[in-house]
């Protein structure tokens, strides 16, 4: 199957953001945000490196591995579990076919463990059941799984209710965040092989998959999701964990900060209204190219109306762009961590000269929070200001909010990747440590 015939990434211009007028007055108007064509081969060299290593392995002394079944590429399922959403679909497609909230509902009245078969976890559309009062629970904290039982419930719902498939008939590729505990991979294997009885599985780093969606083999992945942000240098397919940057603020912190700003202006939002605030953030907010100049614009030019679910209208003003300043000045949300642009430059400065030059032109933006209007433009401006003697280049894809899943779809569809599946019989014979021979 040729992925070139299915889809190809598009190029965005630096002036597409909401601060276009301001950007036209700067020298930045000559810069463009670039992407690579998938025709260049989606991370071919990185995949071939792993394929060569896999072929050089000592043959496992097992009759099973000699005659392990060949998997149909179209049957592979790709799952990207994020703090905000869980995305899944069949490998080979350009975007996930199913996307549900990772937040689940638990009844306030806990069910007894003595034969009570009442439902304990409500997922996806089940959350809208008006007859049951639910407390909302998220099984992830800053991108790391803290409740595996709930993750199992989410996947059960995805496989059985959303995709309507039998997981025992499909190989599954799972994404794993940077700097996650090694035990994560063993828990994924245990759940997929022992609970869902999948025939084969593979685990890949999220940042590497994001890079594959750009058709690159090297790059600096700047990922801003819902619960955590990362800056990950990758060279020839290999992430560099020693200089990877992690920031514990992301989209959920932006939502809370926006709520505080609106309440300071006389609104009355609480945690029960976070879904409404999320919608306001998505539809009304943007990132200012120059917040100081933006503040000089008459407030009436920023003012827009938003209709609440009950039909009432509220007016929004400067909080539309002030909320996003937390990414560049985390002290606004009482965080002592570096700003996103500062962390990006810090990671670049830790690289040797040749690698830094390569990564400087391959800054790859990913994650749902980067979809805010003006985000790429502002990051480009901040990086150019901090690196006047270099030429940093921010690259964007139109659907970078699903970049991790798309990269997994590409990877699982490559013919050269097929020997890297870990099969259930291999897992049963050699144990969880066999994962590290194929997933690295």
Curated annotation (Swiss-Prot):
Localization in the cell: Cytoplasm, Cytoskeleton; Golgi apparatus; Cytoplasm; Nucleus
UniProt-recorded name of the protein: Actin-like protein 7A
Tissue expression from the record: Detected in testis. Detected at the acrosome of round spermatids (at protein level).
Species for this entry: Rattus norvegicus (Rat)
Taxon lineage: Eukaryota, Metazoa, Chordata, Craniata, Vertebrata
InterPro entries: Actin, ACTL7A_N, ATPase_NBD
Top-rank taxon: Eukaryota
CDD domains documented for this protein: ASKHA_NBD_ACTL7
GO BP terms, alphabetized: acrosome assembly; fertilization; single fertilization; spermatid development
Region (Required for interaction with TES): 36-56
Subunit structure: Interacts (via N-terminus) with TES (via LIM domain 2). Heterodimer with TES; the heterodimer interacts with ENAH to form a heterotrimer. Interacts with ACTL9. Interacts with CYLC1; the interaction may be relevant for proper acrosome attachment to the nuclear envelope.
Family: Belongs to the actin family.
Function of the molecule: Essential for normal spermatogenesis and male fertility. Required for normal sperm head morphology, acroplaxome formation, acrosome attachment, and acrosome granule stability. May anchor and stabilize acrosomal adherence to the acroplaxome at least in part by facilitating the presence of F-actin in the subacrosomal space. May play an important role in formation and fusion of Golgi-derived vesicles during acrosome biogenesis.
Keywords, ordered alphabetically: Cytoplasm, Cytoskeleton, Differentiation, Fertilization, Golgi apparatus, Nucleus, Spermatogenesis
A GO CC term attached to the entry: male germ cell nucleus
Main location: cytoplasm
Pfam families in the record: Actin, ACTL7A_N
Region of interest called Disordered, as start-end residue ranges on this chain: 1-27
């Amino acid at each position: 199957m040729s992925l070139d015939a299915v889809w190809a990434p598009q190029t965005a211009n630096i002036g597409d953001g909401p601060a276009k007028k301001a950007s036209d007055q700067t020298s930045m108007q000559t810069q463009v945000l670039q992407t690579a064509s998938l025709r260049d081969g989606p991370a071919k060299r990185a995949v071939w490196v792993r394929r060569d290593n896999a072929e050089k392995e000592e043959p496992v002394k097992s009759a099973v591995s000699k005659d392990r079944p060949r998997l149909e590429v179209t049957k592979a399922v790709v799952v990207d579990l994020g703090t905000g959403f869980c995305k899944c679909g069949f490998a080979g497609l350009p975007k996930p076919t199913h996307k549900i909230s990772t937040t689940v509902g638990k009844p306030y009245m806990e069910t007894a463990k003595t034969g009570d078969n009442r439902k304990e976890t409500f997922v996806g559309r089940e959350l809208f059941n008006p007859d049951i009062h639910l407390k909302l629970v998220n099984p992830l904290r800053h991108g790391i799984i803290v409740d595996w039982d709930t993750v199992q419930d989410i996947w059960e719902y995805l496989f059985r209710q959303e995709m309507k498939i039998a997981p025992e008939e499909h190989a599954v590729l799972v994404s794993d965040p940077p700097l996650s505990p090694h035990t994560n991979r063993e828990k994924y294997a245990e759940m997929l092989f022992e609970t869902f009885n999948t025939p084969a599985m593979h685990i890949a780093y999220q940042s590497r998959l994001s890079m594959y969606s750009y058709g690159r083999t090297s790059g600096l992945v700047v990922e801003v999701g819902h619960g955590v942000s990362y800056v990950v240098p990758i060279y020839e397919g290999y992430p560099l964990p020693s200089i990877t940057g992690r920031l514990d603020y992301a989209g959920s912190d932006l939502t809370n900060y926006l709520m505080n700003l609106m309440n300071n202006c006389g609104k009355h939002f609480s945690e029960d209204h976070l879904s409404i605030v999320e919608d306001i953030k998505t539809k009304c907010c943007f990132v200012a190219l120059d917040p100081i100049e933006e503040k000089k614009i008459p407030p009436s030019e920023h003012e827009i109306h938003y209709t609440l679910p009950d039909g009432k209208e509220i007016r929004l003003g400067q909080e539309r762009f002030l909320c996003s300043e937390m990414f560049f000045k985390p002290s606004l949300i009482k965080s002592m961590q570096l700003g996103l642009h500062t962390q990006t430059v810090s990671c670049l400065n830790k690289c040797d000269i040749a690698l830094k030059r390569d990564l400087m032109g391959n800054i790859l933006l990913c994650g749902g929070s980067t979809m805010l209007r003006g985000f790429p433009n502002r990051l480009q401006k901040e990086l150019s200001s901090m690196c006047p003697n270099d030429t940093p280049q921010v690259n964007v894809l139109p659907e970078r909010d699903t970049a991790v899943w798309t990269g997994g779809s590409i990877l699982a569809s490559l013919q050269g990747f097929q020997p890297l599946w870990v099969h259930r019989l291999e897992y049963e014979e050699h144990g969880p440590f066999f994962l590290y021979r194929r997933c690295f």
